[in-house]
């Protein structure tokens, strides 16, 4: 069995961060979202992985390499522009061959899904197996309609009047039958080859399409709110450890991870929080639910429930919360600040905030 990981797309909902970085590499608890998926695929016993890449191919390749760090063998499949999930399957035909495969959206975050779904698929080997989850607003997702026995009757892509609240999670399992389906469908009104249309083709052809309503956690990390929520969830599992320097005037409270080379001076850090390697925190309050990446500087400031990327600097800011701050951003004080500041700043930005 192989894996097809989709790491193209433009990440418009995470702009300006994704103007200069692949959305799949935005870190959660200081580790790129994509890496969690690759680790889950390896844990399921799959080694051969094809990664579909687009405009950010160089960045993805630099981060993942040949996959050996994950125990994987990685191949890269270029997609000239986003033309739909089914198009990703179409252009990956040579890599996939006649093998069964799992298709995994690289910007999704799932817990307790991949291993179980692969095991279930291998045991029953239907033509397609879909992972579903109940959502409060199904009109924003691909939605499945099921029979009383759980058989998939039909799929709709972002329907105006959904027939269920069961949304498609970004994990699909297919037999080689899917290749006939993606070759048979035509582009949707969006000009894309939709995977929902390909699966519907299998259903209409009388093929065996099954589903599982997952009990594990799932988030599409395509927007800031969901990124912060996933960061919170992962930080909840953080084991406290201090490999850096914390002076006697500082307090680490709860699950705080201070990585090697980090310094905390005259500050209070409330867990769960991660302080990245080489980061300096001085005269500040950080956390809870905060990730500071490597080589950041936080001084005379408060940062809570936020993700701060590599090399960012925050100085003299009374309070930042619920924020995603890009690489090498500089945030400094300026007159007349509100009590809290909510920011989404792209890489290499400069912002002035009053103290």
Swiss-Prot record:
UniProt protein name: Glucose-1-phosphate thymidylyltransferase
Cofactor(s) it depends on: Mg(2+)
Gene: strD
Pfam families with a match to the protein in the record: NTP_transferase
NCBIfam families linked to this entry: rmlA_long
GO molecular function, one term: glucose-1-phosphate thymidylyltransferase activity
Biological process, per Gene Ontology: streptomycin biosynthetic process
Described function: Involved in the biosynthesis of the streptose moiety of streptomycin. Catalyzes the formation of dTDP-glucose, from dTTP and glucose 1-phosphate, as well as its pyrophosphorolysis.
UniProt cofactor note: Binds 1 Mg(2+) ion per subunit.
EC class of the enzyme, as a word: transferase
Pathway: Antibiotic biosynthesis; streptomycin biosynthesis
Catalyzed reactions per annotation: dTTP + alpha-D-glucose 1-phosphate + H(+) = dTDP-alpha-D-glucose + diphosphate
Keywords for this protein: Antibiotic biosynthesis, Magnesium, Metal-binding, Nucleotidyltransferase, Streptomycin biosynthesis, Transferase
Similarity comment text for this entry: Belongs to the glucose-1-phosphate thymidylyltransferase family.
Binding, Mg(2+): 107, 220
Entry's EC annotation: 2.7.7.24
Organism this protein belongs to: Streptomyces griseus
UniProt cross-references to Gene3D superfamilies, sorted A to Z: Hexapeptide repeat proteins, Spore Coat Polysaccharide Biosynthesis Protein SpsA, Chain A
């Amino acid at each position: 069995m192989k894996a097809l990981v989709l790491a193209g797309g433009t990440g418009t909902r995470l702009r300006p961060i994704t103007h200069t970085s692949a959305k799949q590499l935005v870190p959660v608890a200081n580790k790129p979202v994509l890496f969690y998926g690759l680790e889950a695929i390896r844990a399921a016993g799959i080694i051969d992985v094809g990664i579909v890449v687009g405009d950010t191919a160089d960045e993805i390749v630099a981060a993942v390499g040949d996959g050996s760090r994950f125990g994987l063998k990685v191949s890269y499949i270029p997609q000239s522009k986003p033309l739909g999930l089914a198009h990703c399957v179409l252009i990956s035909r040579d890599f996939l061959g006649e093998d069964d495969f799992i298709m995994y959206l690289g910007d999704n975050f799932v817990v307790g899904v991949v291993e179980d779904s692969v095991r279930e698929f291998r045991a029953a080997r239907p033509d397609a197996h879909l992972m579903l989850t109940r959502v409060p607003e199904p009109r924003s997702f691909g939605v499945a309609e099921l029979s009383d026995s759980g058989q998939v009757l039909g799929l709709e892509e972002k329907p105006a009047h959904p027939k269920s609240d069961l949304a498609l999670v970004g994990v699909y399992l297919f037999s080689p039958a899917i290749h006939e389906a993606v070759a048979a469908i035509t582009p949707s009104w969006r000009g894309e080859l939709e995977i929902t249309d390909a699966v519907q083709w299998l259903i209409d052809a009388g093929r065996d399409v099954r589903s599982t309503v997952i009990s594990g956690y799932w988030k599409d990390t395509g927007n800031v709110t969901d990124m912060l929520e996933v960061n919170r969830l992962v930080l909840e599992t953080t084991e406290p450890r201090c490999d850096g320097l914390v002076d006697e005037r500082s307090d680490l409270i709860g699950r705080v991870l201070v990585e090697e080379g980090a310094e905390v001076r005259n500050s209070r850090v409330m867990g769960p929080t991660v302080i990245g390697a080489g980061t300096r925190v001085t005269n500040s309050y950080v956390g809870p639910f905060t990730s500071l990446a490597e080589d950041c500087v936080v001084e005379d400031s408060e940062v809570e429930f936020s993700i701060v990327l590599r090399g960012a600097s925050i100085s003299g800011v009374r309070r930042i919360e619920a924020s995603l701050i890009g690489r090498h951003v500089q945030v400094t004080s300026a007159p007349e600040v509100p009590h809290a500041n909510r920011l989404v700043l792209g890489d290499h930005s400069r912002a002035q905030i009053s103290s």
